[in-house]
Amino acid sequence: MASLSTMHLINHSPASRRRIMSAAAAAAAKLHLPECFTITKSAWMNNTENLTLNYQLNHKKISKVAGINRVATVDAPQVHDQDDSTENQGHDAVNNIEDPIEYIRTLLRTTGDGRISVSPYDTAWVALIKDLNGRDAPEFPSSLEWIVRNQLDDGSWGDDKFFCVYDRLVNTIACVVALRSWNVHDDKLKRGVTYIKENVEKLRDGNVEHMTCGFEVVFTALLQRAKCLGIEDLPYDSPLIQEIYHSRQQKLNRIPMEMMHKVPTSLLFSLEGLENLEWERLLKLQSADGSFLTSPSSTAFAFMQTKDEKCYQFIKNTVETFNGGAPHTYPVDVFGRLWAVDRLQRLGISRFFESEIAECLAHIHKFWTEKGVFSGRESEFCDIDDTSMGIRLLRMHGYDVDPNVLRNFKKDDNFSCYGGQMIESPSPIYNLYRASQLRFPGEEILEDANKFAYNFLQEKLANNQILDKWVISKHLPDEIKLGMEMPWYATLPRVEARYYLQYYAGSGDVWIGKTLYRMPEISNDTYHELAKTDFKRCQAQHQFEWIYMQEWYESCNVEEFGISRKELLLAYFLATASIFELEKTKERIAWAKSQIISKMITSFFNNHNTSSEEKLAFLTDFRNSNGLNNTNMVLATLTQFLEGFNRYTSHQLKNAWGEWLAKLQQGEGDGAADAELLTNTLNICAGHIAFREEILSHNEYTTLSNLTSKICQQLSQIQNEKKMEIEGQMTAETSIKNKELEQDMQTLVKLVLGKSSGINRNIKKTFLAVAKTYYYRAYHDAQTIDTHMFKVLFEPVV
């Protein structure tokens, strides 16, 4: 029989080892589906949503891999132990991940105030500031030079890779005004004017969701400046422009002028478009860095009106940082770090950057306030988007965060991105929804947030209203739809990563502020390439392991115990979708084998043909370590599994399995006992227990174990009832929305994510990982699980 102990290639010479791995890798390259896992060609070619996977359960063995012992291919560390020889050249790209990892590490370590693209609009406002010594020249000539250098071929200014009419027009009018103010580059000015005149009517067809922030207010304010400067040929009196003026006036009439002078509001972001401002009062709302709500254009306008020194220093620092340019908002240290961590986690590559992520989140926690956070640190104004992302990520990493901070964004039964928001957008509410799923018992604000966000997003999806006002992302509707179909409890890490590989656009995502902008810490092609390469490497390893698992299935005659290949595949998939890292072969195989072996033993004990004497003999031989020489296939399989580890690990495993067998003998073998056995097996095999066996009886460990067992028992019951309902045997009486189950899951999440009283965090995470696989099986139907298995284990990553 195949065993883990035979998986190591230590006894092979380096040359032999390379030949073995090369042949195995070549086999993996061809292996898309195992023989027992087939799919109709038409269904796959059409990429239908209702993809069905038909298992052909046969007794054929997978063909030998070029005469190589397939067991050897499961040695995880050897997968990337290859040289530059010709036979391995086809796999060099897959294994060469050090360069992108180092690039991303450097990117994260040097984030500073955040990286963001320059805004021509804001740069133009900075260029309007007159020389402080009275000369007829700009105070920041480098800003004017930036404008001159960055006009696009069509005469406009703006994002050169994505066309948004609002972005192009507001940038272009601002740059035209700046050029005329200093009477320079008349040729560029005329080309800009021509562009505005020829394209302004496109506003009628523009997506209102993609309208840049405050467009009606700031665009018309700049048109007025252009008119005062005598710029001719602009469509000042066109019907469309008059409509925009009307919209501006309506918006200005709604502004609570008294309120905006008292407390920080979003209006501080666009002061350059407002009238009748009381600057003495507004200066009291200035941010600590001298800006008005991190906006260079708003701050530049404020400086023109007040000559405030703090405003000047903010502008000067920004211009120096961006070589004459100015972004639409700065700093973006909070926003950049939060979304970078989120992207790396969802792409499944965060493990390469643990120390960098820890530093990012420590930075966020340092600037966390009772109001929440904003895109830049030390802001009195906060928003629900950054705050929700902060709650979720900080909580996931063990920080104590009070979710009641979300009450700042709640009015009646509704939540909004910030006070005074006119049109609510999907992406911030989706992040609120994601945060609300990590709730602890008694957190009513997260329960309210969950209900609101769920209903809001379902309505948006139903009405096909997923265009967002903060980000232009091709796959945002798919991402939100999947998030609604797969709640966090029922989401496994590798399934999430596989889908997010499809949805993440890298540098293709464009963000919307006063202008369009891009952020390399968030939208980065290197993230995407590394994630795809890493997924391919892991998937190849998983396919090696799956070959091995089928060999083991055959050699142990598992099918004789009523366990199908499909059940074997499901057991291995659940392990792989939860613990996917290359180096964790041992844990994956232990997970899958323990699930199958426990079923074999249960089948043996529950078989009416098994006598009491045979059961007693089984237990006696197990206790006496007399398994390998026993004719009982079940006991031999169990013994071989337990002896595939070092002596101390085998001893701990035998104790854990002995306790489970005792419960089985007493008729207590159920989902609870199985879950307890699995978590103990995983923690022991992973080395979390090591020489500290007392951990297994630690109060926190037993609390986690008992709660996880209870949850898994409930979920097993739900799953069994669902299966029987499908077969027409009964109507399911237990719902996965059971209130007690929800409370138990919340308690488990709190125990795992909260502060520990002596138990390693990795040990606690094992309990949650196991519970989530039970939840996953109870929540999703068989067809959905089949699709996930195919995508994670066999579908090539393009």
Swiss-Prot record:
Q: In which tissues is it expressed?
A: Highly expressed in roots, and, at low levels, in stems and leaves.
User: Where does this protein chiefly localize?
Assistant: plastid
What are the recorded GO MF terms, alphabetically? copalyl diphosphate synthase activity; magnesium ion binding; terpene synthase activity
Name the needed cofactors. Mg(2+)
Q: Which GO terms describe its cellular component?
A: chloroplast
InterPro entries on file: Isoprenoid_synthase_dom_sf, Terpene_synth_N, Terpene_synth_N_sf, Terpene_synthase-like, Terpenoid_cyclase/PrenylTrfase
Q: At which positions is substrate bound?
A: 251, 469
Look up the signal peptide feature and give its range: none
Supply the enzyme class, top level: isomerase
Q: Which reaction does it catalyse?
A: (2E,6E,10E)-geranylgeranyl diphosphate = (+)-copalyl diphosphate
Identify its protein family: Belongs to the terpene synthase family. Tpsc subfamily.
User: What's the miscellaneous note?
Assistant: Abietane diterpenoids (e.g. miltiradiene, abietatriene and ferruginol) accumulate specifically in the periderm of roots. The ent-kaurene diterpenoid oridonin, main constituent of Isodon rubescens, accumulates in leaves.
| Function statement | Involved in the biosynthesis of ent-kaurene diterpenoids natural products such as oridonin, miltiradiene, eriocalyxin B and nezukol, known to exhibit antitumor, anti-inflammatory and antibacterial activities. Catalyzes the conversion of (2E,6E,10E)-geranylgeranyl diphosphate (GGPP) to (+)-copalyl diphosphate ((+)-CPP).
Q: What is this protein called?
A: Copalyl diphosphate synthase 1, chloroplastic
Please give the organism: Isodon rubescens (Rabdosia rubescens)
Question: Lineage of this protein's species?
Answer: Eukaryota, Viridiplantae, Streptophyta, Embryophyta, Tracheophyta
Gene name, Swiss-Prot/TrEMBL: CPS1
